[in-house]
Amino acid sequence: PNHIHDIFQNGLPADFRLIGATTRMPNEIPPAIRSRCLEVFFRELEKDELKTVAKTAADKIEKNISEEGLDLLTSYTRNGREAVNMIQIAAGMAVTENRKDITIEDIEWVIHSSQLTPKHEQKIGVEPQVGIVNGLAVYGPNSGSLLEIEVSVTAAQDKGSINITGIAEEESIGSQSKSIRRKSMAKGSVENVLTVLRTMGMKPSDYDIHINFPGGIPIDGPSAGIAMAAGIFSAIHKIPIDNTVAMTGEISLNGLVKPIGGVIPKIKAAKQSGAKKVIIPYENQQAILKQIDGIEIIAVKTFQEVLDEILVNPPTEQKPFHIEINKESV
């Protein structure tokens, strides 16, 4: 027909907008599609929001669930779909036994049968400690988590050593069709940390240093740089670190704090873990951060500023530390 021929020749006079939604990770989507799309990432639901979703799902099928049951359920769910699915399966058990209530035993059965793992919900320590520092990490598409880093230092018998546990030795980058392996950036940033400590007059080679990342969170990237440096400094000088402060930022060879990614989910994770302050790189300041209430956000340019914020009762008669920074690099 002529109208079909005209469409092939001249196109269709319309402006189309195709909207697609997916739960896939960004690196699982073909680059040819991503390059032609405007990507919009939705934040992860908070625990109270997941409770609301689960409670609404239970009300729709006329079943009751206790607050303790909601707490347990939301500890194992990461989105609304998972919460609704767990409610429906647990409600099926209640219907079979002619019960109006969804019990904790029902939810535990769903958890064990589905082999679910709890979400990582780290809380800050109860008091300042030497060598214990609160770092921040991002895992998954947009989930933040508090990262308690432990540092132990002992005098070396001969030449000192450094041992790092809890992080990947190597990273794989690229797509499913092509990827390369490289040394972990998190492990490589330790070398930057040691260089900065040497410029402060310290001798890391005199000590056996052990840095541990507990909790099983996959750490990648150099964003734990200032946290590792603070932990080593605290362990060597025996100065406690404020347990109510969390921090994130890359550290350069000159002692500067460089910007990192995922700053918003990291700040929210610090707030949820009970931290009162969070330290971020100066270059990560954004107007949207002013909308986050309940936590003080401190933007720093140098590692010296980090130490000024976190050390508890440092020696005042003579500071044993100082970083010489090239002013032109700031």
Range-by-range predicted roles:
Residues 1-21:
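AAA+/SF3 P-loop NTPase mechanochemical coupling elements
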Residues 3-5, 69, 263:
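Amphipathic coiled-coil/heptad-repeat helices and related helical stalk/stem segments
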Residues 18, 39-41, 297-299:
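Conserved beta-strand scaffold positions in the cores of enzyme catalytic domains, especially
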Residues 19-22, 37, 50, 73, ...:
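Conserved RecA-like P-loop NTPase ATPase core
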Residues 26-32, 39-104, 199-206, 239-242:
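Conserved C-terminal "switch" segment of AAA+ ATPases
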Residues 43, 66-67, 73-83, 100-104, ...:
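Conserved phosphate/pyrophosphate-binding and hydrolysis machinery centered on Walker-type P-loop NTPases
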Residues 88, 93-122, 282:
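Conserved C-terminal helix/linker of AAA+ ATPases
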Residues 121, 126-133, 147, 153-330:
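Peripheral, non-AAA+ core regions of ATP-driven protein-machinery
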